[in-house]
C-alpha cells in the first residue's frame, strides 16, 4: 500500500485487540509495479501519469520495504517530474522502524528525512531523526508502523470485522503519528476485474481480495485526529499482502494505481 503523503492513506476497538493478533498474520515477499494515473473528484482525470514500484522482502527478524513513486505532471511549458523514494526496515514484532524518505523534483533533491522509531514494552515509544538531526517525536501507546497496520487490516478482514482505528507512524515528516480510520467493505463491481499480471498468477491463486478505505487525520493538540482527513486512500489487496489497486485522494485531486507486474521474491532461511 502507498503510505506517505502520496506514498501513503468506524468502529473503535480496544488497543490490545488491535495489536496482539497481528503477529499471526504473514505476508509474502514480492515485487510489484503499478501504472499511475490522475483522479479528479474521484473520477479519471488528466495531467498526471507515472509509475509506482513496491518491494517487500522478509528477513529472519522482520521486513524490508522499498517503494518509489515517479510522477510526471503537466506544467505551463513542459512536464515536471517528481519522485518519492522510501526505504524502511520494520521488526517482526512491530516495535522498531528504521526509515529514509527522499523527494526529488526536476532531478534535484528537495527533501530527505531519516531516523529510527522504537516502541517499548509499555506500548509507548519515540522516533529519533538523524535528518533533520536532533529532532524527536513521541509515539502514543500502540502506534502501528507500515507493515504492522497492513497485517492488522488483513487480520480484521479475515475475521469479518468492519474496520478499526489506529495511530500510524511512517516517518516522512517530523510530526506526531496520524489517526487512521479504516473501513473494510464489499469489493466494488468496477474493481472485481483487476487482473493479475502474467507470471504472477501463482501468488494470487486461491487468495481472497480485500477492499478497504482509510482516512488519515493529523493529530491535534489533544493527540486526537479531528475534522476532515488530511487525505484518504482505498485499496484492493490480497489476503497475503499483495496490493492490486489503490487510490490516494487529497482535496479535489488524487491518483489511482493499478498493478502491471508481479513477481515472487525468495524467503529467508532462518534457524
Regions found by a protein language model. Name each.
Residues 67-121:
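Hydrophobic/aromatic-rich structural module bridging two neighboring secondary-structure elements via a short loop
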Residues 102-271:
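Mature, soluble, non-transmembrane domains
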Residues 8-17:
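Bacterial N-terminal signal peptides
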Residues 22-79:
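N-terminal cleavable signal peptides for secretion/export
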Residues 47-52, 81-85, 109-113, 228-232:
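Short, surface-exposed coil-to-beta transition loops
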Residues 32-34, 50-52, 65-67, 84-86, ...:
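Hydrophobic residues positioned within well-ordered beta-strands of beta-sheet architectures
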Residues 1-6:
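Positively charged n-region of N-terminal signal peptides that target proteins for export
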Residues 24-28, 55-64, 89-95, 203-206, ...:
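A short, structured loop/turn motif at beta-sheet edges
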Amino acid at each position: 500500500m502507498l503510505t506517505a503523503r502520496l506514498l501513503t492513506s468506524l468502529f473503535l476497538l480496544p488497543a490490545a485487540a488491535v495489536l496482539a493478533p497481528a503477529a499471526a498474520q504473514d505476508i509474502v515477499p514480492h515485487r510489484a509495479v503499478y501504472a499511475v494515473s490522475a483522479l479528479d473528484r474521484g473520477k479519471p482525470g488528466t495531467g498526471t501519469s507515472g509509475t509506482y514500484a513496491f518491494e517487500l522482502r522478509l528477513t529472519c527478524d522482520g521486513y524490508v520495504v522499498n517503494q518509489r513513486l515517479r510522477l510526471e505532471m503537466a506544467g505551463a511549458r513542459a512536464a515536471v517530474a517528481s519522485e518519492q523514494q522510501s526505504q524502511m526496515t520494520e521488526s517482526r514484532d512491530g516495535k522498531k522502524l528504521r526509515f529514509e524518505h527522499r523527494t526529488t523534483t526536476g532531478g534535484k533533491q528537495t527533501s530527505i528525512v531519516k531516523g529510527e522509531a522504537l516502541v517499548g514494552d509499555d506500548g509507548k515509544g519515540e522516533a529519533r531523526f538523524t535528518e533533520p538531526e536532533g529532532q524527536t517525536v513521541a509515539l502514543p501507546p500502540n502506534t502501528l508502523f507500515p507493515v504492522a497496520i497492513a497485517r492488522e487490516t488483513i487480520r480484521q478482514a479475515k475475521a469479518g470485522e468492519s474496520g478499526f482505528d489506529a495511530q500510524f507512524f511512517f516517518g516522512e515528516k517530523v510530526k506526531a503519528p496520524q489517526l487512521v480510520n479504516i473501513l473494510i467493505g464489499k469489493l466494488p463491481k468496477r474493481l472485481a476485474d483487476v487482473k493479475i499480471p502474467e507470471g504472477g498468477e501463482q501468488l494470487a491463486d486461491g487468495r481472497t481480495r480485500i477492499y478497504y478505505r482509510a482516512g488519515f487525520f493529523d493529530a491535534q493538540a489533544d493527540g486526537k485526529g479531528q475534522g476532515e482527513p488530511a487525505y484518504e486512500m482505498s485499496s484492493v489487496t490480497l489476503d497475503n499482502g499483495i496490493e492490486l489497486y489503490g487510490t490516494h485522494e487529497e482535496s479535489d485531486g488524487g491518483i489511482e494505481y493499478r498493478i502491471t507486474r508481479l513477481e515472487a521474491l525468495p524467503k529467508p532461511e532462518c534457524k
